C-alpha cells in the first residue's frame, strides 16, 4: 500500500522508525542490505551513509517488520512491496564514491534527479574553489598574483627613468600608470626605482640633487655631475645642451649654498692662525724703510722678515711698528763718517739675534703674554744660563764696573742735553714702554732704570759722533761691557772699537724676551 498523496511511493512507517534509531544502525543495516549487490558496495557503505538522509535509506530495510515496530499496519505491507528501485539505486549510488572514474560516468546516468547536486561535493578539490579555472591554490587568483620583472616590463621603467634623469622620483599617479602598463604592483615599481637610483649613485652617475642634504651625498653628486656633463655634451645636440644649461646652473648654486651648511672647523684654519696677512704687511713695511746704501741692512731686514714670519701671528703688529722705528733711528741717526764704520754693523749685530733666539722665544711663549710668567721665566733663565748668552746689561748684577761706567757718562759729557730730547721721542716707540713691568722685574738695580737707559743711549750716540775725550773716558767701562759680547759675536766688531761695542751692547736683542730691544 503506497501513499501517492505525499508524492513518495514508499510508506511513512520507516521514516518514523529511522527518526528514532541511531546512525550506526542505519549503516549496519544498509551494509547487510547491499551485500548481495556486489563486493564493491560493502566497502563503500560506511562512506555514503552520512551523506544521504536517513529517511531515504530506511526504505531499503526489508528485514524490519513495520507492523511489529508500530502495531498499526499488518505484516504484508512491509514485505509485499519490493521497492526494487531503491535497492538497485543504493548499489548504483555507490559508484559515485568508487575509485574508478569509468564507473562514475556509467552510474551517474541512473542516479535520481534530486540527488545529482550532491555529487559536486566530491570533485578532486572543493566546490567553493571551482570558480577559479587557472589554479587550485584556493586563496589567490592567478590574475592578482605578483609577476616577476621581465625585460619587457623593465624596459618601460628604464625609458621613464631616462626621460626623467633630473628628477627620478615618480609621483603616486605615475607609479600607478607604470604599474598598469607593466602589470606589476606598486611595491614592485617603487622598489625598482629605489634600486635604480641606488645603482646610479654607486656608479657616480647621479644627475639629480639629493633630497636629503647629507655630506656623503654631495661629493658623488658633484663628481657625477662633471662626468655626466662631459658625456651629455658629446651625446646631445647643441640646442638641447643650451636648454639644459639653466637648470644645471641652478643646481650648482644650490650645491654651493648647501656646502656652506656642513662647514668643517677641523679642515679650515681659523683666520687668527694665518701667517700670510702679517707676512705681506711686513714685507710692505720693511721695504718702505729708508735704509743705508750698504747691503747688510737689507740682509738684516730679510732675516728679521723670515724670523717674524716663522714664529709670528696677529699679535706682532705692534712689534713691527717698533721695529720699523728702530730701523729708522738706526739708519738715520749716525751719519756714515770715515772714522766710524759701525753704522751698518750695529744694525747687523742688533738683528743677528733674531733668527737664532727670537723664533724659539716666540714659539715657546703663548699668544697673550703673561707678565708674571715672562718675568719669572726671564729671571730663572738669567740665573741658570751663562753670561756669554746674554748681554751684560740683561744680568741682574754686573758688579760695580758697569754701573759706574754708565753713571759717569752724563757727568763727563757736556753734549748730553742736545740728543736727549730725541732719545725721549724714540723712547716712546721702544718696546720697553709696553714691557715696563717685565723690565722692572729683570733690572733690579735703580741705576738701570729707564731714565738711565735713555741717558746711556744718548751718551753712546754722542760717542759715535765724536770719538774723543768721551770715548777715552768710557774706555774702561766700554771694555768691561763688550767683553762678554766679544765671545757671543766673534765676527761682529773687533776688540779695539769701544764706542761701536757700547752701541751694539745697548742695541742688542735679549734672547729670553724674544722682543726687539731698543732703548
UniProtKB/Swiss-Prot annotation:
Disulfide bonding pattern of the chain: none
SMART domains cross-referenced by the UniProt entry: HOX, IRO
Domain of life: Eukaryota
Protein name per the record: Iroquois-class homeodomain protein IRX-4
Chain segments carrying region Disordered: 204-298
Source organism phylogeny: Eukaryota, Metazoa, Chordata, Craniata, Vertebrata
One biological process term in Gene Ontology: heart development
Alphabetical list of CDD domains matching this protein: homeodomain
Acidic residues bias spans: 223-235, 257-267
Amino acid at each position: 500500500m503506497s501513499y501517492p498523496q505525499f508524492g513518495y511511493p514508499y510508506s511513512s512507517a520507516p521514516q518514523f522508525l529511522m527518526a528514532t534509531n541511531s546512525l550506526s544502525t542505519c549503516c549496519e543495516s544498509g551494509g547487510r542490505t547491499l551485500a548481495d549487490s556486489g563486493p564493491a558496495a560493502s566497502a563503500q557503505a560506511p562512506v555514503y551513509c552520512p551523506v544521504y538522509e536517513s529517511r531515504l535509506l530506511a526504505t531499503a530495510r526489508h528485514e524490519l517488520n513495520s507492523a511489529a515496530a508500530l502495531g498499526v499496519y499488518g505484516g504484508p505491507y512491509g514485505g509485499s512491496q519490493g521497492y526494487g528501485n531503491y535497492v538497485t539505486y543504493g548499489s548504483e549510488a555507490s559508484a559515485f564514491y568508487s575509485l574508478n572514474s569509468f564507473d562514475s560516468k556509467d552510474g551517474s546516468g541512473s542516479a535520481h534527479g534530486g540527488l545529482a547536486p550532491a555529487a559536486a561535493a566530491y570533485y578532486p578539490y572543493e566546490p567553493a574553489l571551482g570558480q577559479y579555472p587557472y589554479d587550485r591554490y584556493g586563496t589567490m587568483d592567478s590574475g592578482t598574483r605578483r609577476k616577476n620583472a621581465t625585460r619587457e616590463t623593465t624596459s618601460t621603467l628604464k625609458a621613464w627613468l631616462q626621460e626623467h634623469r633630473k628628477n627620478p622620483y615618480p609621483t603616486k599617479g605615475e607609479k600607478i600608470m607604470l604599474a598598469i602598463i607593466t602589470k606589476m604592483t606598486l611595491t614592485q615599481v617603487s622598489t625598482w626605482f629605489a634600486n635604480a637610483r641606488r645603482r646610479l649613485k654607486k656608479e657616480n652617475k647621479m644627475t639629480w640633487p639629493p633630497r636629503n642634504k647629507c655630506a656623503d651625498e654631495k661629493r658623488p653628486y658633484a663628481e657625477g655631475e662633471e662626468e655626466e656633463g662631459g658625456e651629455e655634451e658629446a651625446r646631445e645636440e647643441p640646442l638641447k645642451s643650451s636648454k639644459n644649461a639653466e637648470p644645471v646652473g641652478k643646481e650648482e648654486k644650490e650645491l654651493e649654498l648647501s656646502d656652506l651648511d656642513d662647514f668643517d672647523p677641523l679642515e679650515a684654519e681659523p683666520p687668527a692662525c694665518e701667517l700670510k696677512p702679517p707676512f705681506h704687511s711686513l714685507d710692505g713695511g720693511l721695504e718702505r724703510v729708508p735704509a743705508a746704501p750698504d747691503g747688510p741692512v737689507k740682509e738684516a731686514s730679510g732675516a728679521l722678515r723670515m724670523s717674524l714670519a716663522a714664529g709670528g701671528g696677529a699679535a706682532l703688529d705692534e712689534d713691527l711698528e717698533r721695529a720699523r722705528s728702530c730701523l729708522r733711528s738706526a739708519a738715520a741717526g749716525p751719519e756714515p763718517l770715515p772714522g766710524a764704520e759701525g753704522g751698518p754693523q750695529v744694525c747687523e749685530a742688533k738683528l743677528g739675534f733674531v733668527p737664532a733666539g727670537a723664533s724659539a722665544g716666540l714659539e715657546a711663549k703663548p699668544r697673550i703674554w703673561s707678565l708674571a710668567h715672562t718675568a719669572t721665566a726671564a729671571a730663572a733663565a738669567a740665573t741658570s744660563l751663562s753670561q756669554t748668552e746674554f748681554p751684560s746689561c740683561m744680568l741682574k748684577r754686573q758688579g760695580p764696573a758697569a754701573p759706574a761706567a754708565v753713571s759717569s757718562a752724563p757727568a763727563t759729557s757736556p753734549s748730553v742735553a742736545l740728543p736727549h730730547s730725541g732719545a725721549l721721542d724714540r723712547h716712546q716707540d721702544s718696546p720697553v714702554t709696553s714691557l715696563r713691568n717685565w723690565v722692572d722685574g729683570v733690572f733690579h738695580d735703580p741705576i738701570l732704570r729707564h731714565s738711565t737707559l735713555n741717558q746711556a743711549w744718548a751718551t753712546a750716540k754722542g760717542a759715535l759722533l765724536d770719538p774723543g775725550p768721551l770715548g777715552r773716558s768710557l774706555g774702561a767701562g766700554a771694555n768691561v761691557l763688550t767683553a762678554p759680547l766679544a765671545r757671543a759675536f766673534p765676527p761682529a766688531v773687533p776688540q779695539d772699537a769701544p764706542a761701536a761695542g757700547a752701541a751694539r751692547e745697548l742695541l742688542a736683542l735679549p734672547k729670553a724676551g724674544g722682543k726687539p730691544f731698543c732703548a
